[in-house]
């Protein structure tokens, strides 16, 4: 998920998406522990998406200006 897509979401949608990603991260952690995880890159992707969502939530809460990527 790109940062501009995350910024377009409402605060409620951000919270829902964060909850969904945390559940998926939890399931992937168990798959890794039991040796059933096939796509190991997905855990890194989810971790970064969670960080993006948390960053956007903080920006919206504090009213920080949005900077576009160069």
From Swiss-Prot:
Keyword check for Plastid: no
GO annotation terms (biological process): translation
Classification via CDD domains: Ribosomal_L29_HIP (cd00427)
GO terms for cellular component: cytosolic large ribosomal subunit
Keywords: Ribonucleoprotein, Ribosomal protein
Record carries keyword Ribonucleoprotein: yes
Domain of life where this protein originates: Bacteria
One function term, GO molecular function aspect: structural constituent of ribosome
Pfam families in the cross-refs: Ribosomal_L29
Family the entry assigns: Belongs to the universal ribosomal protein uL29 family.
Protein name: Large ribosomal subunit protein uL29
UniProt source species: Xanthobacter autotrophicus (strain ATCC BAA-1158 / Py2)
Source lineage: Bacteria, Pseudomonadati, Pseudomonadota, Alphaproteobacteria, Hyphomicrobiales
């Amino acid at each position: 998920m790109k940062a501009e897509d995350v910024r377009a979401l409402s605060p409620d949608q951000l919270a829902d998406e964060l909850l969904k990603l945390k559940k998926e991260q939890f399931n992937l952690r168990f798959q890794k522990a039991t040796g059933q995880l096939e796509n190991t890159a997905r855990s890194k992707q989810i971790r970064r998406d969670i960080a993006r969502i948390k960053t956007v939530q903080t920006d919206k809460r504090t009213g920080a200006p949005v900077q576009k990527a160069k």
